[in-house]
């Protein structure tokens, strides 16, 4: 049964499905473990968007990562670009728990190698799928941020990219609300 679910949720460039149906905590655990085995690094960046099922997904996915003794840099509730930016800056692999533009009952994952190199169908995603398609003991624990949390440091980094003094003219700007993480706007401004 898991194999059929994996066939349904592994897409060309990400993993997504209806939460509680085609993707659930057991599958998230297996994918977390498989991703941690696939990447050579000992530390993985993890963030999530604002979906209701993300806490359950976070618990399961990070439990899978920790099952092989890898560390997590938790960035919290962020847009997808934050995980990719930190992956590039820190040269660490990353994962964002999100189903992107899909309806609210969906959830999934976008994965990248160190340096923000996306993992897709032809660059390791099918290898991760094979690793996830094994019978493993599943031990899901409530995620506790005992590892590193870089959310605040990242927002400070963004705020320091441009100093208010360097802007000498009236500034017009736009806000992209398309990624669904309104809290980030509040933290940055």
Where are these regions (language model features)?
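An N-terminal, well-structured beta->alpha segment
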Residues: 1-63, 67-69, 144-171, 177
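Generic secondary-structure boundary/loop-capping signal
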Residues: 6-16, 20, 75, 103-109, ...
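Short, electropositive, low-hydrophobicity segments enriched in small/polar residues
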Residues: 18-24, 36, 51, 80, ...
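Generic secondary-structure boundary signal with a strong preference for alpha-helix termini
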Residues: 26-29, 59, 88, 120, ...
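Alpha-helix boundary/capping residues
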Residues: 35, 90, 132-135
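Short, surface-exposed, polar/charged, turn-prone segments marking secondary-structure boundaries
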Residues: 38, 72-75, 101-103, 121-127, ...
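Ferredoxin-reductase
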Residues: 40-114
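Gly/Ser/Thr-enriched, mixed-charge loops and adjacent short helices
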Residues: 107-189
